[in-house]
Amino acid sequence: MGKIIGIDLGTTNSCVSILENGNVKVIENAEGARTTPSIVAYANDGEILVGQSAKRQAVTNPHNTLFAVKRLIGRRFEEEVVQKDIKLVPYKIVKGGNGDAWVQAGGKDMAPPQISAEVLKKMKKTAEDYLGEPVTEAVITVPAYFNDSQRQATKDAGRIAGLDVKRIINEPTAAALAYGMDKAKGDHTVIVYDLGGGTFDVSVIEIAEVDGEHQFEVLATNGDTFLGGEDFDMRLIDYLVDEFKKESGMDLKNDPLALQRLKEAAEKAKIELSSTQSTDVNLPYITADATGPKHLNVKISRAKLESLVEDLVQRTIEPCRIALKDAGIDASKIDDVILVGGQTRMPLVQKTVADFFGKEARKDVNPDEAVAMGAAIQGAVLAGDVKDVLLLDVSPLTLGIETMGGVMTALIEKNTTIPTKKSQVFSTADDNQGAVTIHVLQGERKQAAQNKSLGKFDLADIPPAPRGVPQIEVTFDIDANGILHVGAKDKATGKAQSIVIKANSGLSDEEIERMVRDAEANAEEDRKFEELAAARNQGDALVHSTRKMVVDAGDKVTAEEKAAIEAAVVALEAAVKGDDKAAIDAKVEELSKVSAPVAQKMYAEQSAEQPQGGAQQAEPEAKHDDVVDAEFEEVKGDDKK
């Protein structure tokens, strides 16, 4: 039996790993990098470029360079998130023949799994070059919040790439698996906070040691499949576009070439601001008009970036709250917080997570590689090479069917450990009803129409009988990959019908020495620059917090106070754009002085408020009879498929 590789098929970057001699090895690609950009490009000569080579030519070939395709996988064209993405990417998103969101490049319409397959082929080739033997089996990870269609489409991508996908596992579970191999003895409850390029999810995982074996159980999971580093980049891009428009009067939104350069610059600036207080985005010849070429040069502070993305970071907290509630665990009971995904390197994200969970997150797990490493461990478990790990994953959303009155009746509740099988008996709504439609749904809403439809099928030839007499057994079976199989059987005749829910679908010594000499010669200049950057940062942060305070205060701020604060804010904003640290300090002092009375009012009010305690209401346990008179809608003759 060949090796089973572990692949993290990411929105922004992908990674491949293998378990060798008991150690997990992340495999470098042909370019020597441990991660590969999840980018596929179609060149004019018909060549397909994948990874870094595709990313390099993106500026000159924006319409045929496909990135972040994972955000489209297993999605319908009409979905709001797809329509939103159409406005944001330079390539074309089109409606496939089956109603799915497809992409257009190189003169062809292609399904997202075809594009993802090109990335998987690159991962497969990377592993084969390292191992010196063919690789045909893999474990591929997906966001925990991926629905059934998205999981199936990911499996399809593996098949297109020539891989037998042995298991689809959740990214946070994989990360915990990578972390758990060398963990301390005893039981642990871990939060995996995974903020990647295009998706966010959070999982509460219990790692129990049972007779020397490590048992990983996902207690709860939650997230947002359309929130990630790409959204942070877009905020920065929008800001740069607005700043350029203010300065030159030209809108770069309709220039794909300019947008592609802006995307690269924004990503670079965002990464730099995780380790520095300010950076410059300098793009010469970004565009041109009748007067000649135009150049973009914008200085961005860390505080400015944080103000642009603050709401995105806050959006990650509600899923954390829900996951803890679903798991029935208090934040104080969490032993470790693991950060996964490149976007978690942002200081604001780390601070927000630490504030919410009341503890610093661990930094000993590489956020870019942990998921692929976990997938490789799971591959070794399946191959029988690792025997002391048991993985218990969960279904992320409730699954059920539509019953009379447009109600969704749940068969498998969310956060149920998989694989699982559940049956329930239903009956007919009308006398002599000859057929029923089984409408399979996924979601948390009681109203069927507000949940995601996974598919429909009919069970016909039911013998005539009064309503409520026929017994129709509906069975939901989720396999270890999270793929759903649904069956319906008339218990009287034994007639059955079933459906598998599918997706429609480093520096040299010389350079270091030169830098040291330069730094010594320019130490004074560097010190002044650092002080100026810190002052600008403080100014930007004060502007943002003051404006937020005024909004929060509402009518507690008088018109005179508001006018004085706004004037001081405008003066500080002007000073921050200059190079005079003393002027910035003076304006900071001025704004602090005029806003102090409002801040005191707010503080006094908050102190007066008493913290409110809440009691949890216990839900009475519902009793289920063997037969649920849920009553299907009748299938009319012309409705049958």
Swiss-Prot record:
Keyword set, alphabetical order: ATP-binding, Chaperone, Nucleotide-binding, Phosphoprotein, Stress response
Region Disordered, residue ranges: 602-641
Comp. bias intervals (Basic and acidic residues): 620-641
InterPro entries found in the cross-reference section: ATPase_NBD, Chaperone_DnaK, Heat_shock_70_CS, HSP70_C_sf, HSP70_peptide-bd_sf, Hsp_70_fam
Claim: Nucleotide-binding is one of the keywords in the record: yes
Tree of life domain: Bacteria
Residue(s) carrying Phosphothreonine: T199
Induction annotation: By stress conditions e.g. heat shock.
Biased segments, Low complexity type: 604-619
UniProt GO MF annotations: ATP binding; ATP-dependent protein folding chaperone; unfolded protein binding
PROSITE patterns registered for this protein in UniProt: HSP70_1, HSP70_2, HSP70_3
Function according to Swiss-Prot or TrEMBL: Acts as a chaperone.
Family the UniProt entry places it in: Belongs to the heat shock protein 70 family.
NCBIfam families per record: PRK00290.1 (NF001413), prok_dnaK (TIGR02350)
Protein name: Chaperone protein DnaK
Organism: Pseudomonas putida (strain GB-1)
